[in-house]
């Protein structure tokens, strides 16, 4: 049995330590800066020059292969100067798409402003009426983003981590400033199982001194105690993470210096005649040499294998002995992820019924308290679950390296005999559905809290789709999988059904449809096709549920509609969108803000996946009122595909002619022909 546990752990560990690179379908919007100090009119010369400049920067002939270009249009006082800088690891095609996307959004985000900076994950676009070329700007327009987590609650460890990051990034800044592309990446060992990754870049038109000064300003402005941070100025960018967020193979490395010439042969004290082929003993001699070489090589390989097994066994002992005090710490390395089963057993009072707080995707969930007072949620795999083993591995592989304030944190896991256990941070307010759909608790969620929940879920999906080093499709986004912390901040949970997409992959097909009926996109539910747009659809359903305070499945014939989407669409087309709003918040919300969110929700649930906005666009719509929203098309109505149900309990499955499916608040684990 111990060998089986070792194998399972090594299998998981091999996934945990592998590196992935995400690719985004659309550029990931970060921020924009457009001070209203100077403006221009629509029909002015400056407006014409600006459009000429933007057209030039986004033309087919722009320098996307180098990732940098500047341009000027017009004459003073209406001259416009602009540039773009693409991240050093992106391809020319990605660079071009990012610049074009940014140009298309420019006049919406910053209308009639004479200078602006637009930050995207893959590029920066900038223009001004001032001369911005060959000039480092470090006094305005910065964008700062930091992970909320620190490496450890121990201050000594935090100080050590901060010092390491500071010295590493400062050294990298000097190397970036000295390079021809003004670019340098970091990939250095932090611990035995954790590397530190970084990327520093300046616009290539800066001098060495200006580039170094700009990057050092970025480093000094970052919260280096966090496990990830970035600070972008209009002229330079600096970022570090504990995962490989860039494509290292796409960044050119300087060629190795040529090998030194071989030393001249030393003169021998005894003259040795040259050996000719005629002096060799023949085939038997060659065979002897070959046999000896093979034997020596085999012995060396055997010794290496024995040494590797010894080290692996020695290291595994450290994995099996995680103590209760270690459990409370932030788990920054893989060796602290596997927890001692007895510690978990004690924390949950031997999985007492009184400690049970719910049921997850593949087992029951318990509240646990470790000896240091740390409260945790413990998910225990059901031994009778067909899909539990696969979902357990998926959840560990996916969640272990994800670090975001809107994703639930995995603190560890345990493999003990048949036991499969996941340990998460504890969420005192349970899940969104517990508050949103409970008539006695709905009053706790005012409009501002609901709006914050919508924005937090969007940020979490953004991270999964585009900002993580993995591209992850959740496939089961629903109210019961959105947990709420003590401050009602949302955290996406339950990744047992998630799929990891490879480089440049945008969609996939499956014959095993998993998820929750009512939240699943039509193309996925009917044909098994899933993509980022499938999660966008689920997000749209969530938005409409949060605004209305009603489940998608809570409608009956008396409502004149059989689901929430039908109801919302009818109200929208009849120009009665505000009738959708939960009466508990109707009097204390901004009508324009609520209607805009309903509009966004309907855009997300459109039947055609191509018409649904990418989550980066959704986030931009939520955070900027200057973005114009397109007219929504009719949503995908699952109701047309649903057969008449037999009278079932609320936790049973409904049956259609072609396959069984579950109702809205229960997850499907398998769909198959009857």
Curated annotation (Swiss-Prot):
Keywords, comma-separated and alphabetical: ATP-binding, Glycoprotein, Kinase, Membrane, Nucleotide-binding, Phosphoprotein, Receptor, Repeat, Serine/threonine-protein kinase, Signal, Transferase, Transmembrane, Transmembrane helix
Active site, per annotation: 476
Top-rank taxon: Eukaryota
Protein's UniProt keywords contain Signal: yes
Glycosylation sites: 36, 43, 61, 70, 104, 178, 247, 286
Positions carrying Phosphoserine: 480
Main location: membrane
InterPro entries hit by this protein: CR_prot_dom_plant, GNK2, GNK2_sf, Kinase-like_dom_sf, Prot_kinase_dom, Protein_kinase_ATP_BS, Ser-Thr/Tyr_kinase_cat_dom, Ser/Thr_kinase_AS
Inducing stimuli: By salicylic acid (SA) or by a bacterial pathogen infection. May be regulated by WRKY DNA-binding proteins at the transcriptional level.
GO terms assigned for molecular function: ATP binding; protein kinase activity; protein serine kinase activity; protein serine/threonine kinase activity
Signal peptide span: 1-24
Compartments in which it is found: Membrane
Gene Ontology CC, one term: cytosol
Zinc among keywords: no
PROSITE patterns linked: GNK2, PROTEIN_KINASE_ATP, PROTEIN_KINASE_DOM, PROTEIN_KINASE_ST
Pfam families assigned to the protein according to its UniProt record, in alphabetical order: CR_prot_dom_plant, PK_Tyr_Ser-Thr, Stress-antifung
Protein kinase domain location: 351-637
Annotated positions of the Phosphothreonine modification: 516
EC number(s) per entry: 2.7.11.-
Sequence positions that bind ATP: 357-365, 379
The reaction(s) this protein catalyses: L-seryl-[protein] + ATP = O-phospho-L-seryl-[protein] + ADP + H(+); L-threonyl-[protein] + ATP = O-phospho-L-threonyl-[protein] + ADP + H(+)
All residue ranges annotated as the Gnk2-homologous domain in the record: 28-132, 139-245
Bias kind Polar residues: ranges: 650-659
Residue numbers spanned by region Disordered: 254-284, 648-674
Bias (Low complexity): 268-284
Protein name: Cysteine-rich receptor-like protein kinase 6
């Amino acid at each position: 049995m111990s060998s089986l546990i070792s194998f399972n752990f090594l299998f998981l560990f091999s996934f945990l330590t592998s590196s992935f690179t995400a690719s985004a379908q659309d550029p990931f919007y970060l921020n924009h800066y457009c001070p209203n100090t100077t403006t221009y009119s629509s029909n002015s010369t400056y407006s014409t020059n600006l459009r000429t400049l933007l057209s030039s920067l986004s033309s087919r002939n722009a320098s996307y292969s180098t990732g940098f270009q500047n341009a000027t249009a017009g004459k003073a006082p209406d001259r416009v100067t602009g540039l773009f800088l693409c991240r050093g690891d992106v391809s020319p095609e990605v660079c071009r798409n990012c610049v074009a996307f940014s140009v298309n959004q420019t006049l919406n985000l910053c209308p009639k402003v004479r200078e602006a900076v637009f930050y995207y994950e893959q590029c920066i676009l900038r223009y001004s009426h001032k001369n911005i070329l060959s000039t480092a700007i470090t006094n305005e327009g910065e964008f700062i983003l930091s992970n909320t987590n620190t490496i450890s609650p121990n201050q000594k460890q935090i100080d050590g981590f901060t010092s390491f990051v500071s010295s590493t990034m400062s050294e990298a800044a000097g190397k970036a400033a000295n390079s021809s592309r003004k670019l340098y990446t970091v990939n250095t060992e932090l611990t035995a199982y954790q590397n530190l990754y970084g990327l520093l870049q300046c616009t290539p038109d800066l001098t060495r001194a200006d580039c170094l000064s700009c990057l050092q300003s970025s480093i000094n402005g970052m919260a280096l105690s966090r496990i990830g941070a970035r600070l972008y100025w209009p002229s330079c960018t600096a970022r570090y993470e504990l995962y490989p967020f860039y494509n290292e193979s796409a960044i050119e490395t300087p060629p190795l210096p040529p090998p030194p010439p071989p030393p001249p042969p030393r003169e021998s004290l005894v003259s040795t005649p040259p050996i000719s082929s005629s002096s060799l003993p023949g085939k038997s001699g060659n065979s002897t040499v070959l046999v000896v070489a093979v034997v020596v090589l085999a012995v060396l390989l055997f010794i290496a294998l024995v040494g590797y097994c010894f080290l692996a066994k020695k290291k595994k002992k450290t994995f099996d002995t995680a103590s209760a005090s270690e459990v409370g710490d932030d788990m920054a390395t893989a060796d602290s992820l596997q927890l001692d089963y007895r510690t978990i057993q004690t924390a949950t009072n031997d999985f007492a019924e009184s400690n049970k707080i719910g049921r997850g995707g593949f087992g029951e969930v318990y509240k646990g308290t470790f000896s240091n007072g740390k409260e945790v949620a413990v998910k225990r795999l059901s031994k009778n679950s067909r899909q539990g083993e696969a979902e357990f591995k998926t959840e560990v592989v996916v969640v272990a390296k994800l670090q975001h304030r809107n994703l639930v944190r995995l603190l560890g896991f345990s493999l003990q005999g048949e036991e499969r256990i996941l340990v998460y941070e504890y969420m005192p307010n349970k899940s969104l559905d517990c508050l949103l759909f409970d008539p006695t608790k709905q009053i706790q969620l005012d409009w501002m809290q609901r709006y914050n929940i919508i924005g937090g879920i969007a940020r979490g999906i953004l991270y999964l789709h585009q900002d993580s080093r993995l591209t992850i499709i959740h496939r089961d986004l629903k109210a019961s999988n959105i947990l709420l912390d003590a401050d009602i901040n949302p955290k996406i949970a339950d990744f047992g059904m998630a799929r990891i997409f490879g480089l440049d992959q945008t969609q996939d097909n499956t014959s095993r449809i998993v998820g929750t009926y009512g939240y699943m996109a039509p193309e996925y539910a009917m044909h098994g096709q899933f993509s980022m747009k499938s999660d966008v659809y689920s997000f749209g359903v969530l938005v409409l549920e949060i605004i209305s305070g009603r489940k998608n499945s809570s409608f009956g014939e008396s409502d004149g509609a059989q689901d929430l989407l039908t109801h919302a669409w009818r109200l929208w087309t009849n120009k009665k969108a505000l009738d959708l709003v939960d009466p508990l918040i109707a009097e204390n919300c901004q009508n324009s803000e609520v209607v805009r969110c309903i509009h966004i929700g309907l855009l997300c649930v459109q039947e055609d996946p191509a018409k649904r906005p990418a989550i980066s666009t959704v986030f931009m719509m939520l955070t900027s009122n200057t973005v114009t929203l397109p007219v929504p098309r009719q949503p995908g109505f699952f109701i047309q595909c649903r057969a008449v149900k037999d009278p079932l309990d609320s936790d049973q499955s409904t049956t259609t002619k072609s396959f069984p499916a579950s109702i809205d608040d229960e997850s499907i684990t398998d769909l198959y022909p009857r």
